[in-house]
Curated annotation (Swiss-Prot):
This is Endoribonuclease YbeY. Keywords: Cytoplasm, Endonuclease, Hydrolase, Metal-binding, Nuclease, Ribosome biogenesis, rRNA processing, Zinc. GO terms for molecular function: metalloendopeptidase activity; RNA endonuclease activity; zinc ion binding. The keyword Oxidoreductase does not apply. The lineage of its organism: Bacteria, Pseudomonadati, Pseudomonadota, Gammaproteobacteria, Alteromonadales. Gene3D superfamilies: Metalloproteases ('zincins'), catalytic domain. GO terms for cellular component: cytoplasm. Binds 1 zinc ion.
Amino acid sequence: MSLELALDVQYATTSDWLPTEEQLMLWAKTAIGNGMDRAELTIRIVDSRESQMLNSTYRGKDKPTNVLSFPFEAPAEIELPLLGDLVICAAVVENEAREQNKTLEAHWAHMVVHGCLHLLGYDHIEDEEAEEMESLETQLIESLGFTNPYKEQ
């Protein structure tokens, strides 16, 4: 059974290169894939200012970050296919890609996969959880034709 994904993409910034809605759809479907048969997801691509404001408000960190995940948490008695929202900062992704010698496309794919896994409940706070999440991310990213995102370039 293939995933039916309703994706809302919001481009709230500009850049020399941003992923297309088709690329975002492919990467999100790959990450969510077998976890659900229907899902709704919003991906908002923002500038550093908006990322910093959200990161400060929700995580207490007064700086922009690559990706923020906001899972939708419905009351237990309500079953909705709403997965949640991802907010991705284009400038941070660009800087990280450059620093890590990765292509923009590869790093964007990694950030979408990483964020979707957070929405599915994965985390990387504890070492054991981090290993599980990174292993799954690596499998998913490699299935998309990119190299291991955690391998030093």
